[in-house]
């Protein structure tokens, strides 16, 4: 029995009315659901596509199972039936359904065939009853873990549609389900000893003898996150129109944590000029699925950063993951570089503003044996550029605009996010902060890869073709080269025929005395000024395969010696 009248739903977007009951004995959710879909595509539809990601755990033949196996993990291959998840559909009904079936190619896509076409602007209401067997959370981070439940991607939902194409995306353990923003109204019942935390708003709680029922709702929601925990691990922080629940701050006092949450929230929302209401569940597990590379490789007894600093940047990264997923409407699989690049770009800006003196190796930079090495002078944010270049030198990198299902794990988690983030920083330096903000604001209002590319390719204030075609869309590494022709001229080349705007700087006593911007490779006349050496891109650097040819000393063929190691 459903708990909200369906006619209270908004008429312009998809909506879900859900009644779910958790059985903690057999780790199942029994679900009754009414879902309403509006045809916002550009064609009449003869079928509706649903995504049933809970069923991606059913056996070793699913796309998820193959993905986990391809990443050299045998945990799923040898999992017991009790550890795996599945969906048992009991009924799918509507006055306009001819038939339905599971996709032949994958077990987590459902095709519903209609009796008559659903015209543009028309809606269909579907009632579905099913039971979800929750998986062990060790596979993807979602499901059951001892006595706790981490619920995400368990609801059968409408696949997104852009133009005339259904996404029809299977679960590949990429945390990238891309759904249309929808209205959710839910009643979920469970054993009374559990605490519930969610990105939905809790409207009411009913206590019975042995169970608890919680009524939740939310508008403009991309996906639903619910944690059911034995312990009250989350802290709640409220501002004027924001509510954030997080389990990250364990060392910081409540007052310190509230200050940091407000600072991160205000910084991000100010940058995006966002005054909307916000309800986020910012979990440490979101960070652990994609941590800062390098920090997670350190053994627990080595801690170059204070616990309070680590808590703040872990919260910042997890906040950005959840915030961008909620605010952007692009296909997260096709356009992953936008989500991951913006995440790294904002983190870089935040650390530059509030922690500009924090070093790449933290407190280890003060150890005498390391003081004379370049690594001790590198800032924390330098890790994004350095790890991006590191993967390029290993020749393991892939193009950023390649759909994430084809990226290797090192590219998905490290190289592509860092490369994209550094690229946005470089772009901001070229076109200015306000122009980049305006560009990002426009990105938040589009939902297709074609529109995204056109936004850059048709940009009026500057030629940004290079960014999409040569930087994001090209696997070939950049290699700018500075060559002295004679006493008065230099030549700038790009050895791999990649078109990238650049600047030339003249330095004296390690200070920049003049920079000139260029958009083409050519001979350049050296100005009549007193300088020590010439350098390509002295302010903001791009990932390059070889930077040893980016310098020329004025009075010597020697170049500044840099010793770097990862």
Locate predicted features.
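N-terminal, polar/Ser/Thr-rich
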Residues: 9-30, 42, 155, 465-466
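Ligand-binding face of N-terminal immunoglobulin V-set domains in extracellular IgSF glycoproteins
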Residues: 28-62, 67-75
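Solvent-exposed beta-strand/loop surfaces of large extracellular or lumenal domains
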Residues: 58-114, 137-142, 201-209, 281, ...
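Extended, low-hydrophobicity, Ser/Thr/Pro/Gly-biased non-transmembrane segments
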Residues: 72-91, 104, 108, 127-227, ...
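Juxtacatalytic substrate-recognition/specificity segment
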Residues: 186, 235-338, 342-350, 544
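Beta-strand-rich binding/interaction modules
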Residues: 197, 280, 435, 464-467, ...
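Acidic/His/Gly-enriched intrinsically disordered linker/tail segments
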Residues: 334, 340-422
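Amphipathic alpha-helical substructures
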Residues: 404-485
């Amino acid at each position: 029995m459903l708990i909200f009248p369906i006619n209270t739903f908004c008429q312009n977007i998809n909506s879900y009315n859900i009644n779910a009951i958790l059985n903690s004995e057999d780790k199942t959710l029994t679900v009754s659901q009414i879902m309403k879909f509006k045809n916002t595509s550009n064609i009449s539809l003869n079928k509706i596509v649903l995504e049933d990601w809970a069923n991606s755990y059913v056996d070793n033949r699913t796309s998820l199972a193959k993905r986990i196996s391809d990443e050299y993990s045998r945990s799923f291959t040898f999992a017991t039936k009790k550890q795996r998840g599945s969906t048992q559909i009991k009924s799918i009904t509507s006055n306009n359904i001819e038939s339905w079936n599971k996709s032949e190619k994958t077990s987590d896509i459902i095709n519903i065939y209609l009796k008559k076409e659903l015209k543009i602007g028309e809606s269909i209401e579907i009632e579905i009853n099913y039971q979800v067997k929750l998986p062990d959370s060790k596979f993807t981070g979602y499901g059951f873990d001892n006595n706790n439940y981490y619920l995400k991607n368990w609801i059968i939902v409408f696949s997104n549609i852009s133009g005339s194409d259904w996404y029809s995306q299977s679960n590949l353990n990429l945390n990238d389900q891309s759904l249309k923003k929808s209205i959710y109204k839910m009643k979920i019942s469970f054993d009374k000893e559990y605490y519930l935390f969610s990105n939905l708003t809790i409207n009411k709680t009913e206590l019975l003898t042995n169970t608890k029922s919680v009524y939740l709702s939310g508008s403009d929601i991309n996906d639903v996150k619910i944690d059911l925990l034995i312990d009250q691990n989350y802290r709640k922080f409220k501002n004027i129109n924001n509510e954030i629940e997080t389990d990250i701050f364990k060392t910081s006092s409540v007052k310190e944590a509230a200050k940091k949450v407000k600072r991160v929230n205000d910084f991000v929302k100010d940058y995006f000029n966002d005054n909307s209401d916000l309800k986020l569940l910012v979990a440490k597990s979101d960070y652990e699925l994609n941590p800062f590379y390098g920090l997670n490789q350190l053994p627990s007894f080595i801690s170059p950063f204070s616990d309070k600093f680590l808590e703040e940047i872990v919260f910042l990264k997890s906040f950005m993951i959840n915030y961008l997923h909620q605010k952007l409407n692009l296909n997260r699989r096709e356009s992953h570089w936008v989500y991951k690049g913006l995440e790294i770009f904002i983190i870089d800006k935040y650390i530059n503003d509030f922690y500009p003196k924090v070093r790449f190796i933290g407190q280890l930079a003060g150890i005498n044996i390391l003081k004379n090495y370049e690594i001790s002078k590198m800032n924390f944010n330098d890790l994004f550029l350095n790890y991006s270049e590191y993967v390029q030198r290993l020749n393991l990198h892939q193009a950023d605009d390649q759909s994430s299902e084809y990226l290797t794990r090192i590219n998905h988690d490290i190289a592509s996010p860092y490369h994209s983030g550094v690229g946005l920083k470089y772009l901001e330096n070229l076109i200015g902060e306000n122009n980049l903000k305006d560009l990002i604001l426009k990105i938040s209002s589009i939902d297709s890869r074609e529109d995204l590319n056109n936004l850059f390719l048709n940009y009026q204030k500057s030629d940004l073709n290079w960014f999409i075609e040569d930087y994001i869309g090209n696997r070939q590494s950049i290699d700018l080269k500075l060559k002295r022709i004679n006493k008065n001229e230099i030549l700038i080349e790009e050895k791999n025929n990649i078109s990238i705007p650049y600047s030339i700087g003249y330095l004296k006593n390690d200070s920049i005395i003049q920079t000139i911007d260029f958009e083409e490779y050519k001979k350049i006349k050296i100005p009549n000024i007193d300088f020590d050496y010439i350098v390509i891109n002295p302010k903001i650097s791009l990932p390059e395969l070889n930077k040893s040819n980016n310098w020329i000393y004025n009075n010597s063929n020697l170049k500044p010696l840099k010793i770097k190691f990862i």
